[in-house]
A protein has these predicted regions:
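Conserved acid/base catalytic micro-environments in cytosolic active-site loops
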Residues: 2-8, 14-29, 35, 40-41, ...
């Protein structure tokens, strides 16, 4: 029994509680230790039952999912997987929940679709088992010591005034993330200066609709312009484009973005590898790749392409990663130039861009031993 993942299912729908708890408990590696009908009930049961993982509905009476999550993380920190509907409102709340400490989220399946339900529950079980492996103390540390969000007006690049606010030389920063990524992105992107001499591409493993909410949330917090990428967008310094869910984002001639639905890579679409490889081919040594927290190895091949083109790769370190799978895959292959805690990554991006703005190619720096 000690090897089982102990789960508390929280949902205001009696049907959802019954179906989810019964289906999840069919997995031999999972034990459903209880169910709760709202946030107040959930708080009491989290404290009494001490589950490894809580599945938490977004919309509930008396105490909603976001408030319940905040209370759980403050009073009895536990790995939480949010259950969200594919609606704009739920997507907005889910993004905030991932900032507030939720480990992951899962699209809530229809309780009446028996055919799709079995497949969906299998996916939920995978999320539950992954969440159980998370060191929740890392999440708590990130919540307590995370950098404050701001919309500062400061400039790190005085020379940009000569170019109407945008630098002449343009780097391309590609940030890839998965599990734990939204919280990490909210600690990096808001601190990038508005006149950074780089265009930024963000690839976060998320479904369609949720990436739009993520872009909107980052835009609310940031100095740079942030929005979901659209076909035909142009790379522009001081702008961050988020790859839309279910589409690969690639960059071609004339700094133009295109989207496609080619087969998933590493089981995901959008793929970090796909975006990084296209940018490495297009921008060469002007690439800066950033690999953040996430499961699996997406980004490893992209990092290899960036290194081959003469670019640089920054990787989030293990202590600040919710899941160290993607960063580890890059580090173990020797593709990481810098392995840094989350709090230092923004400054490293800025420093690399400063170097490029000063017209000093990486290869010349490396020859000097810097």
């Amino acid at each position: 029994m000690s090897n089982l993942t102990r789960v508390l299912v929280v949902d205001d729908s009696a049907l959802a509680r019954m179906v989810i708890s019964r289906r999840v408990s069919l997995d031999p590696g999972i034990e459903v230790v209880g169910v709760a009908f709202d946030g107040i009930d959930a708080l009491e049961k989290v404290k009494n039952l001490r589950p490894d993982v809580v599945t938490l509905d977004v919309e509930m009476p008396r105490m909603d999912g976001l408030t319940t999550l905040s209370r759980i993380m403050a009073e009895c920190p536990t790995a939480v997987v949010m259950l969200s509907r594919l609606t704009e409102e739920d997507a907005e709340v889910t993004i905030k929940a991932l900032e507030a400490g939720a480990v992951d989220f899962f699209l809530k399946p229809s309780m009446l679709d028996k055919g799709g339900l079995s497949k969906a529950i299998a996916g939920l079980n995978d999320k539950i088992k992954m969440a159980a492996k998370v060191d929740i103390s890392r999440v708590v540390r990130a919540l307590r010591s995370g950098m404050p969000y701001y919309r500062g007006a400061g400039s790190f690049f005085p020379s940009s005034a000569k170019t109407g606010g945008l630098p002449l030389q343009k780097n391309v920063v590609i940030i890839g993330s998965s599990t734990g990524g939204p919280k990490a992105l909210c600690e990096i992107v808001p601190h990038l200066p508005r006149d950074i001499p780089a265009s930024i591409l963000i690839v976060q493993h998320m479904p369609m609709g949720f990436t739009r909410s993520l872009a909107r949330r980052l835009g609310q917090l940031s100095q740079v312009e942030v929005r979901e990428a659209a076909y035909g967008d142009k790379l522009k310094a001081g702008q961050a484009l988020v790859a839309p869910g279910n589409y690969h984002l690639v960059v071609g001639g004339a700094d133009e973005v295109s989207l496609n639905q080619d087969p998933a890579r590493n089981g995901v679409r959008p793929s970090i590898d796909t975006t990084m490889e296209s940018v490495a081919l297009h921008a060469g040594y002007r690439c800066i790749g950033v690999i953040l927290t996430g499961m699996g190895s997406d980004g490893k091949e992209g990092a290899a392409a960036i290194k081959k083109s003469g670019g640089r790769v920054i990787v989030q370190d293990e202590p600040t990663s919710v899941i160290y799978g993607m960063p580890r895959s890059v580090v173990e292959c020797g593709f990481a130039d810098k392995v840094l805690p989350l709090s230092q990554i923004t400054q490293e991006i800025v420093e690399m861009c400063k170097t490029r703005a000063a017209n000093s190619p990486w290869r010349e720096l490396d020859a000097c031993g810097t």
